[in-house]
């Protein structure tokens, strides 16, 4: 049940971010809306959210979640462009979080750049950590043609 709940939370965060990105600028005489593009998902609590700036995301999750490590980050575009999703958890490296077995709506098959923060990040072609995979150390402005827009799950257990 926890896996279903956390997968739902990740999908909800992705949908909220995607909805914010799809909001038309300048609709009906309103000021243009800056899209939310900085998303965070904390696996241990199921907390997630998307914000229009990194400082808003840090303010929302930073102080309350010092026990959690920033494991890694993915972006929807190359060169850390587009939307960003940061994965946080208490287990750290060497652990395959079941909650990351499916990137869910909004992030599935959209990853173009990745960064392993606390440890290397592995992108998997299919959900449930199946199919072709590539492990990245540090920041990678482009995940390469073999994995670009193909990742469906993420792990932090391979070196």
Whereabouts are the PLM-identified features?
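Compact beta-sheet-dominated domain cores in extracellular/mature segments
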Residues: 2-18, 23-159
């Amino acid at each position: 049940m926890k896996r279903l709940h956390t997968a739902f939370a990740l999908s909800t965060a992705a949908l909220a971010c995607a909805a914010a990105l799809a909001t038309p600028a300048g609709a009906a005489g309103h000021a243009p809306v800056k899209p939310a593009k900085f998303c965070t998902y904390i696996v241990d609590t199921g907390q997630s959210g998307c914000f229009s700036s990194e400082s808003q995301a840090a303010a929302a999750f930073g102080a309350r979640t010092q026990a959690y490590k920033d494991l890694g980050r993915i972006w929807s575009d190359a060169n850390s462009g587009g939307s960003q999703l940061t994965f946080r958890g208490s287990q750290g490296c060497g652990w395959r979080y079941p909650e990351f077995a499916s990137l869910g709506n909004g992030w599935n098959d959209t990853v173009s750049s990745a960064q392993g923060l606390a440890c290397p990040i592995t992108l998997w072609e299919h959900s449930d950590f199946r199919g072709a995979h590539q492990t990245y150390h540090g920041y990678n402005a482009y995940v390469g043609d073999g994995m670009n827009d193909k990742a469906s799950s993420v792990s932090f257990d391979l070196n």
